[in-house]
A protein has these predicted regions:
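Pro/Thr/Ser/Gly-rich low-complexity, intrinsically disordered linker/stalk tracts
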Residues: 51-79, 131-148
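Secondary-structure capping and domain/repeat boundary segments
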Residues: 1-51
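Extracellular low-complexity, O-glycosylation-prone stalks/linkers
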Residues: 79-99
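Short S/T/G- and acidic-enriched coil/turn segments that sit immediately N-terminal to beta-strands
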Residues: 103-107
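Beta-strand-rich modules
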Residues: 109-131
Length: 148
C-alpha cells in the first residue's frame, strides 16, 4: 500500500512474449502507466501480453558474385530485430558458421574456398520481454558452388 506517492508501473518480463501494457480492466480497454499520488483506492491491474511470432524469411537470390564470395539477397520482414545467416560445406550444417545481428536484406559471405559447394540458410528473430531472441524457422537450404 502506497499513499501520497506517485507510482510508475514497471514492465514485467515473460519468455516468448512482449509486454503490451498494464490495464485496469480485463478487456484491456483502459491502459495505465502510473498511479497518481492522489489515488485513494485499490487497483487490480492486468498485464497484456503478445506472443512473439516470427515470419519465415524468403531468399530471393544466392550466387557466387565475386572471387570466393556468395552474395545473398532476401525479402525484408517488418517488425523483426535482425537476421541470422548460417552456411556450411556440409548439407546437414554440422560444422556451420553463423553470422548474427545483420539487419540488411543482403549479405556477402566472404573468405570462401574456390571449388567448394556451400549450403546457406537464413532465419529472422525478434526479442521478447526478457531480452532473449525468439527465432523463426529457417529458409529452405540454398546450394551455391563457388567457382570464381
Amino acid at each position: 500500500t502506497y499513499y501520497g506517492k506517485k507510482i510508475t508501473l514497471k514492465n514485467p518480463s515473460r519468455k516468448g512474449y512482449t509486454f503490451a501494457g498494464w490495464y485496469t480492466d480485463a478487456k484491456f480497454k483502459k491502459k495505465i502507466k502510473t498511479i497518481e499520488s492522489s489515488a485513494k483506492c485499490d487497483y487490480t491491474l492486468y498485464a497484456k501480453w503478445t506472443k512473439v511470432n516470427v515470419a519465415k524469411v524468403s531468399i530471393t537470390s544466392a550466387k557466387n558474385s565475386k572471387s570466393k564470395q556468395i552474395l545473398l539477397k532476401y525479402k525484408k520482414i517488418s517488425g523483426i530485430k535482425g537476421y541470422e545467416i548460417s552456411y556450411s560445406t556440409d548439407k546437414k550444417f554440422k560444422k556451420a558458421v553463423t553470422r548474427k545481428n545483420t539487419t540488411k536484406t543482403s549479405y556477402t559471405i566472404s573468405k570462401l574456398k574456390k571449388g567448394k559447394t556451400y549450403y546457406v540458410r537464413i532465419r529472422a528473430y525478434k526479442v521478447d520481454s526478457t531480452g532473449k531472441k525468439v527465432y523463426g524457422k529457417y529458409t529452405s537450404v540454398k546450394k551455391v558452388k563457388v567457382s570464381k
